[in-house]
Amino acid sequence: MNARKAPEFPAWPQYDDAERNGLVRALEQGQWWRMGGDEVNSFEREFAAHHGAAHALAVTNGTHALELALQVMGVGPGTEVIVPAFTFISSSQAAQRLGAVTVPVDVDAATYNLDPEAVAAAVTPRTKVIMPVHMAGLMADMDALAKISADTGVPLLQDAAHAHGARWQGKRVGELDSIATFSFQNGKLMTAGEGGAVVFPDGETEKYETAFLRHSCGRPRDDRRYFHKIAGSNMRLNEFSASVLRAQLARLDEQIAVRDERWTLLSRLLGAIDGVVPQGGDVRADRNSHYMAMFRIPGLTEERRNALVDRLVEAGLPAFAAFRAIYRTDAFWELGAPDESVDAIARRCPNTDAISSDCVWLHHRVLLAGEPELHATAEIIADAVARA
């Protein structure tokens, strides 16, 4: 039994009268779907502006956002999509469900983001998209990846599910000349329980218009006679969710500023614990939105890491084991897996294998707490690591 107990952390999701008033506003407008109301339209305009994008399209969840973006980028049977081997499974399954082959590549041992050299080595004539995931809100090396994209002609699709409000060398996600997707699932940095968005930079208006049709059963905005222009599905976000997301967006920047300040302290405290290595940074990623507080205990086996997480949870911390390497999940091999064995992929993804075994993360609400709570958090982690 761990002698120390965690302090109270701020609740998540957070809400106040802004969400309440938004829900009433959506209710009273009398139209609760996007084709009849204005909450989704307003949220899309506000979210696009906040991220420097030309357009935003709100959808049902982050996985659908990825599927939709990949589809309008031409991903399908006979194509390949490069993804990080260390990521949530949706990054790979979104491509696999479209009939493509997902090619996992290794990540950097310090930042947990795509290794550009590994990406360059994985590009083939079949590669249709390169998908960087901005892990825990730390943006991937967009300079190196943009150069690979320019040299090969393979476009980037940013999986920004963790990176609401993040920046790379002063540029927002929508200003980096590539399509990006976001998630608004319950634990994310802004949430309506579920939801997602695809943002399109200048020059991608045609893909945006196609995506709108695809996400609405092929129907144009003004269709009243069931003229389905192209094949599609129903991925439309509802008006209630959009009203909540508008309120969530309004407080995003303030929360990011708090998390950033708190991470500076917590990472220093974690780094002082023998055997603990906090997630590294990149000075070019000059605004990290801090979706997770991640750290490694290099050399720890997966079994011992899992026991460590159990002790942290028992003490009251919102702690989690890191993502499993996607090639070590059964789901990865069901559809669109490369013609390689698990061991073959693991040999070229040593960092992923290590991180997925020895990494722990804390939910971002920890970073909304005060300094005393962070000191207490570090003490609990130090005690648990000493017994790991």
Curated annotation (Swiss-Prot):
Activity regulation, free text: AHBA synthase activity is activated by 3-deoxy-D-arabinoheptulosonic acid 7-phosphate (DAHP), an intermediate in the shikimate pathway, and is irreversibly inhibited by gabaculine (5-amino-1,3-cyclohexadiene-1-carboxylate).
Biological processes per GO annotation: antibiotic biosynthetic process; polysaccharide biosynthetic process
Biophysicochemical property: temperature dependence: Optimum temperature is 33 degrees Celsius for AHBA synthase activity. Retains its activity over a broad range of temperature. Over 84% of the maximum activity of AHBA synthase is maintained over a temperature range from 28 to 50 degrees Celsius.
InterPro entries: DegT/StrS_aminotransferase, PyrdxlP-dep_Trfase, PyrdxlP-dep_Trfase_major, PyrdxlP-dep_Trfase_small
pH-activity note: Optimum pH is 7.5 for AHBA synthase activity. Retains its activity over a broad range of pH. Over 84% of the maximum activity of AHBA synthase is maintained over a pH range from 7.0 to 9.0.
Keywords, alphabetical: Antibiotic biosynthesis, Lyase, Pyridoxal phosphate, Transferase
Cofactors: pyridoxal 5'-phosphate
Free-text comment on the cofactor: Binds 1 pyridoxal phosphate per subunit.
Disrupted-gene phenotype: Inactivation of the gene encoding AHBA synthase results in loss of rifamycin formation; production of the antibiotic is restored when the mutant is supplemented with AHBA. Cells lacking this gene do not accumulate aminoDHS, aminoDHQ, or their spontaneous aromatization product, protocatechuate.
Organism superkingdom: Bacteria
Mutation effect (residue 159 to A/E/K): Loss of AHBA synthase activity
Pathway noted in the entry: Antibiotic biosynthesis; rifamycin B biosynthesis
Modified residues (N6-(pyridoxal phosphate)lysine): 188
EC number: 4.2.1.144, 2.6.1.-
Effect recorded for residue 88 to A: Loss of AHBA synthase activity
Subunit structure: Homodimer. Can interact with RifL.
Misc. remarks from the entry: Mechanistic studies show that the enzyme-bound pyridoxal phosphate forms a Schiff's base with the amino group of 5-amino-5-deoxy-3-dehydroshikimate and catalyzes both an alpha,beta-dehydration and a stereospecific 1,4-enolization of the substrate.
Protein family: Belongs to the degT/dnrJ/eryC1 family.
Function: Catalyzes the dehydration and aromatization of 5-amino-5-deoxy-3-dehydroshikimate (aminoDHS) to 3-amino-5-hydroxybenzoate (AHBA), a compound that then serves as the starter unit for the assembly of a polyketide during the biosynthesis of rifamycin B and other ansamycin antibiotics. Cannot utilize 5-deoxy-5-amino-3-dehydroquinate (aminoDHQ), 5-deoxy-5-aminoshikimate (aminoSA), quinate, 3-dehydroquinate, or 3-dehydroshikimate (DHS) as substrate.
Descriptive protein name: 3-amino-5-hydroxybenzoate synthase
Gene: rifK
